[in-house]
């Protein structure tokens, strides 16, 4: 009976079961909730997916016509946090990364982490099996992992990002990139846009240097004949981005770049429930509750004492509200918590945000967190700390659904004022949230769109001599010197 159902499903969709390799090495929870949803959507459509990933989230599925095989690359999220903290990426107040920290030296630790993961015995054993795949999916932040497109050629390569793409992702597709005002590199947006073109030029040079150093490691690890990062990028046929283009300033892109609309991790998510004591406390918070979380990628143990005290002073002055604070146990135990604060190392975030008495969300402006807040109609106060969070916080403020503050300089009175403002104007904020949700409402579910374009790449991959098969532009992965200088006279 099961085989009959599978056969009928494939017949109805007109698809064939594909064998897909997904290489997803970054041990970041906010990344993997998106990647897992994508993998589950592929499996639901009867494809078989082998995932190389760290021990973080379980990708196993049951009762689907496809299957998931997990290859443990064994790199814990805690190791990742320590590596990032020790790399010098975070400078201000212990948790805020400004543009000056985006250097090849600081990012080499991440590249070496990828190298160590791919040297893992489980991964080496997998590579020795000489299996074949119909497609290789690689996370867009990990160009080093593009080597799997070479190892399993001629399978086409697809990149996926949990949110915004990097400038390198766009320029290799020959989409618009590196405009200091309209389409800045995420690092250049970290402060106040000072420096403009000079910042973009510096970041371009830093990432070119990082690519050259990655080339050296790739040849050490996989042999002298291993292609360079630039050459490996040429194998990428499709870039999937888990956000709506309105957040990316409606960037002009070719068909090889697909915005999924955002909320991919929410597409098939089951409703979460609060535990009874927490639900009771929120029910009793008649004036409202404020939820404070800086996401899974920030090690709250690294918060400097001055910033920590600023937060505590803010919470104490919000004494008519319950404050739910996601923070490591060691931090909570080291301070005197105000009586209105409940500190825990983990909350069921979607369930908390959906409670009727939660009136504001203090967030680092991570894309997944903001998607959840918008779904729950909760206004935000953004304290961005790294990467694309600075740009995203500004966009949320521009759309009128959040207040964005300078995390490196904000004081307790300023933070308290912002929180009280979004609470006092809650109805206006929720009305604008409803308008924004209507704008970004999906024409197609993000998981369905991701599967559709993945299947398209696989379907036409064998027609290598047919120009119409590709979603890429004719200028894809062309060096700027060739793109702007070489043309027929």
Swiss-Prot record:
Assigned keywords, A-Z: Glycosyltransferase, Signal, Transferase
Signal peptide region: 1-17
Gene3D superfamilies (UniProt xref): Glycogen Phosphorylase B (3.40.50.2000)
E.C. no: 2.4.1.-
Stored Pfam families: UDPGT (PF00201)
Domain of life: Viruses
Top-rank EC class of the record's enzyme: transferase
Molecular function via GO: UDP-glycosyltransferase activity
Entry similarity comment: Belongs to the UDP-glycosyltransferase family.
Primary role: Catalyzes the transfer of glucose from UDP-glucose to ecdysteroids which are insect molting hormones. Expression of egt interferes with normal insect development and block molting.
Protein name listed in UniProt: Ecdysteroid UDP-glucosyltransferase
Species whose genome carries this gene: Orgyia pseudotsugata multicapsid polyhedrosis virus
Gene: EGT
